[in-house]
Every structure is written in C-alpha cells, then in structure tokens.
Amino acid sequence: MKNIIFISNLMFLFSCGFYSMAGSIPPHIKSIAIPLMDNQTAEFGLAEDITDGILDEFNEAGILRVTDENSAHSILRGTIKKVSEGPYTYSKQESVSEYRYKIDVKIDWYDVSQEKNLLEGTYSGFGAYGLSGDIGSDGIDNDNDGKIDAEDDDEFGEPRAFATRVAVRKIAEDILNDIMTTW
C-alpha cells in the first residue's frame, strides 16, 4: 500500500507538478516595459490608473521582470480608446438603479529583439455602480464577485471610482492572461 501511495505521488509530481505559465512566453523574453498609456478620452487620470493596474498585475505574477524601455526585452504599449457610461439596470418604476462604466484599451506587446508585435488587441473592462453614494450598502455586486455589501470587504469608496477600479483590474488580468497563454 505504501508503494502505491509513493508511486502515485511521484506520478503527480512529474505530470503536473512542474507546470509553469512562463514556459508559454517566447524564451528570449525575460522582461517587459510598461510605459504610461496614451489616453484618447477626456477622463483625467485614467492612463495612470490603467498603467498602474497592469504594472501591479505583472509584479504580482512575477512572470516577467518589469523594467524600463531601454533594457526591456519586450514593451507593452496601450491606448485608451473609449470610455462609455450608461444605464445597466432599472428599478420596477423604470428608473435607472445601476450604471455600467466601461473602458476600451488597445494594446500592443512588442518584441524588441525580433522587432515585431507579439500580441495586438482591444481589451474591455466594466464596473457597475448605483446612485446611493455608498457602495457598501447599495445592494449591488459592484465588482462581480458574487458578494454584496456587508459580505464583500473590498466594496467601499466613491461609486464611480470603484467601478473604474473594477474595470481596470479586469483589463489588467485579461492582458496578463493573454500574454501568458497566447504562445
């Protein structure tokens, strides 16, 4: 019986124990630069918010070393193309009870040594917010995590600003996932 458990553990270790998403990135790319996004919208501070969100995702994942453009193996450039905001849900009285805030960003991931784009695409993220003024008690799942108000410890702050953070986080996660899995 001990031999069966030992062999099972060995099989597990050698089958999936050493899997790494970093193996799907071209092997010569070890670092990435993420300069400030261009902003083609009237939203003040959005370029900084999205750039910081993407930097946070890459630093947390630790897949590529984040560095400056002069020493990077790859560069992730982006342009905020559009911000839209409109009614998302309505009450029984047919008045707007929730708004949807959406951001569209065009991204290019460039390989410096090969002088070519590795990934191009448009990414969108959205967040929802109500009109109550307090997202901690508005009865809305503002960040789409399945938790509402008192159940959700990260729902606080000004509603529209929180919706922006949710949209930025979604965009950053999607970009990182595509970079890690496209190859």
Predicted regions mapped to residue ranges:
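Bacterial N-terminal signal peptides
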Residues: 5-15
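N-terminal hydrophobic targeting signals that begin at the initiator methionine
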Residues: 1-2
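A structural "domain/chain start" motif
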Residues: 13-72, 85, 113-116, 160, ...
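A short small-residue
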Residues: 33-35, 148-157
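Acidic carboxylate motifs that coordinate Ca2+ or other divalent cations, activating on Asp/Glu
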Residues: 138-145, 149
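Surface-exposed short loop/turn segments
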Residues: 77-138, 153, 157-162
